[in-house]
């Protein structure tokens, strides 16, 4: 029983290490007014695993930090597209 508890405790400590935080810059060319970033940010914020969002109208970009164990770039671009603002990863 002690070995099982020790193994579970170790797994609980190590599990967060497996998940990696990633930051991606999305190009969102469809933002045409200063209120568009609000809609884009709201759409991205609904995606599970997103921890930080910075949307800038002037550059028409969204910089998103997320947990890649909970979401993916594809889910982020789908969220912006579903909100009416198609996006792609900026190279």
Swiss-Prot record:
Cellular-component GO terms for this entry: periplasmic space
Record keywords, A-Z: Mercuric resistance, Mercury, Metal-binding, Periplasm, Plasmid, Signal
Gene that produces this protein: merP
Family the UniProt entry places it in: Belongs to the MerP family.
Descriptive protein name: Mercuric transport protein periplasmic component
PANTHER family recorded: P-TYPE CATION-TRANSPORTING ATPASE (PTHR46594:SF4)
Phylogenetic lineage: Bacteria, Pseudomonadati, Pseudomonadota, Betaproteobacteria, Burkholderiales
Role summary: Involved in mercury resistance. Acts as a mercury scavenger that specifically binds to a mercuric ion in the periplasm and probably passes it to the cytoplasmic mercuric reductase MerA via the mercuric transport protein MerT.
Entry-linked CDD domains: HMA
